[in-house]
């Protein structure tokens, strides 16, 4: 099942989400809001369809500072880029400590979805392959955070059934 189809069936969890938009004055607003929320998370679940050193750095920083855990669904290309750019071996060390569980998906990841204990967020792509970080849907209410976690758990089972990553 494609991720888009799965998401459409569960779109109601996003109906009360706040739309965070960057603009010419606050060009980094979505990144800043994402980072502020991620800094408070202790349990992070993520579908990561892109490689961005900036995002990887804030994810690793949050994991280290909060003694947090990460379940990461990504593809081989992104995982290879993360490992190639892991100069201080933080990513590899966190995997060895059991604080990062990486799952490789063999299908297109068409969204950047984060489900944490304190928030959930969704970034989409513009025109199929262009990642749009100027807009983000943000969930902060407890009930929809729980629903987003359930959605992530389903997507995790789907990814594991297709191509689990073993370390």
Give the label of every model feature segment.
Residues 1-11, 55-167:
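PLD/PLD-like phosphodiesterase catalytic module centered on the HKD motif
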Residues 1-72:
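PLD-like (HKD) phosphodiesterase/transphosphatidyltransferase domain
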